[in-house]
Amino acid sequence: MEVNILGLIATALFIIIPTSFLLILYVKTASQQN
C-alpha cells in the first residue's frame, strides 16, 4: 500500500490544529477562574 505523505500531513494538521486551539481556549478559561 502506497502512503500518501501529503495526505498524511494534511490529516495530521487537520487533527492537531483544532485540538491545540481548544486546548489554548481551555487553559485561558481555567486561568481566568483562578
Curated annotation (Swiss-Prot):
The chain crosses the membrane at residues 5-25. One of its GO terms (cellular component) is photosystem II. It is found in: Plastid, Chloroplast thylakoid membrane. PSII is composed of 1 copy each of membrane proteins PsbA, PsbB, PsbC, PsbD, PsbE, PsbF, PsbH, PsbI, PsbJ, PsbK, PsbL, PsbM, PsbT, PsbX, PsbY, PsbZ, Psb30/Ycf12, at least 3 peripheral proteins of the oxygen-evolving complex and a large number of cofactors. It forms dimeric complexes. Belongs to the PsbM family. One of the components of the core complex of photosystem II (PSII). PSII is a light-driven water:plastoquinone oxidoreductase that uses light energy to abstract electrons from H(2)O, generating O(2) and a proton gradient subsequently used for ATP formation. It consists of a core antenna complex that captures photons, and an electron transfer chain that converts photonic excitation into a charge separation. This subunit is found at the monomer-monomer interface. This is Photosystem II reaction center protein M. The gene is psbM.
